[in-house]
């Protein structure tokens, strides 16, 4: 082997070793106790190198280290790069930390980036009920009705967990409440699936009431019969049967229609400018 080839191979090996140490330092797995992120980068660690499935920027978001996220971006980390799971750093940040989300968005992160299952960061923020991340993403142009591989929206993801705070924010931004996924489920039916497992709390009940106000009318029965899992809970089955049997009133259907006609914007601001009495504005905003 020529000396020049040996030097190249040694250089690559050294850089790889530094980059691996960078990942471990960010994750606080310190093989070298005195390592720090800035020194490793200065020494030649590649801020865009992938180790296994991990990239440094994604790892910093996983541990909610906003200062490290900003440092990596300043040193050239690719803000929209995909890791081994086809996820961007923003997907991880959206689950955990608003500060990381804000830094990534400031550096040009795509709020509508898709992972391998076509999930957006907003799907994950809604699922984890990270309400401030939900709001930050929506304010930065995230699509409130983005569809994943199953045609589920962020509202569906929030509803299946009974995440009242995230559901409320998504509805404020005009999320479509009557969306149907590929197997016939709606946001409110996803929430019912949680309630029938006996996992509902007062917050989940409030979430159901909010979705019910938003949708106006919903139907869970097939050929006049409630799903078997609902029928196992007589009290819940009776309540849902009454709600499904009652036709939507003109008032509730008009609310849904007006909200939808306002389009994809922050509805509290849009409704504020309408020439309506305060009581009707509150009604449109699902406050009663």
Curated annotation (Swiss-Prot):
SUPFAM superfamilies: Ankyrin repeat, SOCS box-like. It is found in: Cytoplasm. ANK repeats lie at residues 52-81, 85-113, 117-146, 150-179. Pathway: Protein modification; protein ubiquitination. Belongs to the ankyrin SOCS box (ASB) family. PANTHER family: ANKYRIN REPEAT AND SOCS BOX PROTEIN 8 (PTHR24134:SF9), ANKYRIN REPEAT-CONTAINING PROTEIN DDB_G0279043 (PTHR24134). This is Ankyrin repeat and SOCS box protein 8. It comes from Pongo abelii (Sumatran orangutan). The gene is ASB8.
